[in-house]
């Protein structure tokens, strides 16, 4: 029993406690105005069988593996294999170089059209990015911008489309397609680090057997083709696309336009076996007969 309650509300409070029922689970109610979402009963959607159906392996969780078709030969074994991506990591890649991009580099002065153009000029002019470690084997000259190309150039690329060759020869230029092995390609793209090592310039390797027909064909302007067949191939292409073939022998830049590399040569003006001394700015040439025979073979 509680002690005496002080104040006027004392007797009234005691009477109220005596009259009110005791607090229990039977008389608990939520506060007036409060809301609580009603719990969904099991029988509304997934009750009884819990969505697993009536007996069987599907209800008991012993389903077969993915792709099993009840014992018959599955689909992934009925269809034969085909090597769509076979040898994809060994395929040669060529970065595209459009005529529009080449004209843009010439207009900005990043590529000099009065000098023979090869990968060294294109890489130094930030026209293309070549990564021999990622199976890059050079550039492919494509015909985008053939209608607006106006420069007269002597360019060496690895692949070239027929229309791109026609667009350059229409302006009096010369195109040569040449192969570079990965080591020669890396030296050609980054000559300064190679010269600083003080090593002799190696010989350029010949193309693999699969590429020999391409580089020995005068229609592709291959560097291994017979030079006597080039005039006929140039005239045939001019007739096909309907333009007058300029006579480059009367051009003031004929010496530049007619310059070509030897099949074993990497740089213009530098023969295999030579050593470029960057410190003294000199070129060292071999004099031993065996070395001369090796690098000239």
Curated annotation (Swiss-Prot):
Localisation per UniProt entry: Mitochondrion
UniProt biased composition (Basic residues): 37-53
The UniProt record lists the keyword DNA-binding: no
CC per GO annotation: mitochondrial inner membrane; mitochondrial large ribosomal subunit
Ribonucleoprotein recorded as keyword: yes
Family annotation (InterPro entries): Ribosomal_uL15 (IPR030878), Ribosomal_uL15/eL18 (IPR021131), Ribosomal_uL15/eL18_sf (IPR036227), Ribosomal_uL15_bac-type (IPR005749)
Major location category of this protein: mitochondrion
This protein's UniProt keywords: Mitochondrion, Ribonucleoprotein, Ribosomal protein, Transit peptide
Annotated organelle transit peptide span: 1-22
Source domain of life: Eukaryota
Pfam family, one: Ribosomal_L27A
Annotated GO MF terms: structural constituent of ribosome
One GO term (biological process): translation
Positions of region (Disordered): 27-68
PANTHER family: 50S RIBOSOMAL PROTEIN L15, LARGE RIBOSOMAL SUBUNIT PROTEIN UL15M
Subunit structure: Component of the mitochondrial ribosome large subunit (39S) which comprises a 16S rRNA and about 50 distinct proteins.
Family: Belongs to the universal ribosomal protein uL15 family.
Name under which the protein is recorded: Large ribosomal subunit protein uL15m
Source organism: Bos taurus (Bovine)
Gene: MRPL15
């Amino acid at each position: 029993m509680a002690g005496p309650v002080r104040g006027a509300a004392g007797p009234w409070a005691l009477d109220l406690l005596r009259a009110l029922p005791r607090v229990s689970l039977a008389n608990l109610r939520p506060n007036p105005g409060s809301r609580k979402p009603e719990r969904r009963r099991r029988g509304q959607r997934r009750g009884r069988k819990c969505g697993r159906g009536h007996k069987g392996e599907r209800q008991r969780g012993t389903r077969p593996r993915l792709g099993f078709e009840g014992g018959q030969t599955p689909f992934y074994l009925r269809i034969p294999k085909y090597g769509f991506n076979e040898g994809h990591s060994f395929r040669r890649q060529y970065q595209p170089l459009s005529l529009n991009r080449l004209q843009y580099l010439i207009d900005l002065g990043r590529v000099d059209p009065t000098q023979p153009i090869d990968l060294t000029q294109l890489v130094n002019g930030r026209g293309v990015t070549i990564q021999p470690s990622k199976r890059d084997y050079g550039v492919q000259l494509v015909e985008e911008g053939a209608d607006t190309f106006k420069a007269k150039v002597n360019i060496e690329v690895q692949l070239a489309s027929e229309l791109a060759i026609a667009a350059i020869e229409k302006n009096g230029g010369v195109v040569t397609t040449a192969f570079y092995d990965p080591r020669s390609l890396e030296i050609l793209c980054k000559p300064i680090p190679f010269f600083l090592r003080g090593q002799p310039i190696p010989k350029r390797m010949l193309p693999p057997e699969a590429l020999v027909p391409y580089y020995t064909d005068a229609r592709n302007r291959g560097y291994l083709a017979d030079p006597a067949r080039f005039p006929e191939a140039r005239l045939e292409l001019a007739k096909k696309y309907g333009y007058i073939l300029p006579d480059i022998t009367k051009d003031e830049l004929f010496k530049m336009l007619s310059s070509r590399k030897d099949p074993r040569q990497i740089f213009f003006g530098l023969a295999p076996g030579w050593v470029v001394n960057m410190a003294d700015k000199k070129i060292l040439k071999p004099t031993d007969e065996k070395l001369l025979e090796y690098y000239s073979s």
